[in-house]
Amino acid sequence: MLLYSISKAAEKTSISSYTLRYYEKIGLLPPPKRKNSGRRFYTETDIQFMLFLKSLKETGMSLEDINEFVKDGCILEKINSDVKSAQLSPSINKRIEILTKHLEKMEIKKRELEEVISTTKGKLDTYYSILKEEVENK
């Protein structure tokens, strides 16, 4: 099994070691395994989980919502380990609620960005027209 130090995990995930320690402190990451020296080490599964957290964070999801989203662990693993879906319903419903709310926020941001992009393109067109007229008038 391949093990990663915190610096290697940070490098592999592009998440700073400071942020990894912070995520551990607030309970977003489970406490890592430690060597006899007390140094943290992470497995490939830990790395994949860090990347998942990063992807949620990159969409603008708050740490509070991410923490709520992941607190019950991996639902797919639980389904694969024969946990009854009825037992998972509360977790699934909570995740649906979080994702729905987050999707609504992202849709609003998308519309705002589309407006900014449109305005920026309009400005560029104006500036290109000015330069074109300047060249044609010489």
UniProtKB/Swiss-Prot annotation:
<protein>
    <recommendedName>
        <fullName>Uncharacterized HTH-type transcriptional regulator YyaN</fullName>
    </recommendedName>
</protein>
<dbReference type="InterPro" id="IPR009061">
    <property type="entry name" value="DNA-bd_dom_put_sf"/>
</dbReference>
<keyword id="KW-0804">Transcription</keyword>
<dbReference type="GO" id="GO:0006355">
    <property type="term" value="P:regulation of DNA-templated transcription"/>
</dbReference>
<dbReference type="GO" id="GO:0003700">
    <property type="term" value="F:DNA-binding transcription factor activity"/>
</dbReference>
<dbReference type="GO" id="GO:0003677">
    <property type="term" value="F:DNA binding"/>
</dbReference>
<feature type="DNA-binding region" description="H-T-H motif">
    <location>
        <begin position="6"/>
        <end position="25"/>
    </location>
</feature>
<dbReference type="Pfam" id="PF13411">
    <property type="entry name" value="MerR_1"/>
</dbReference>
<dbReference type="InterPro" id="IPR047057">
    <property type="entry name" value="MerR_fam"/>
</dbReference>
<keyword id="KW-0805">Transcription regulation</keyword>
<dbReference type="InterPro" id="IPR000551">
    <property type="entry name" value="MerR-type_HTH_dom"/>
</dbReference>
<keyword id="KW-0238">DNA-binding</keyword>
<feature type="domain" description="HTH merR-type">
    <location>
        <begin position="3"/>
        <end position="72"/>
    </location>
</feature>
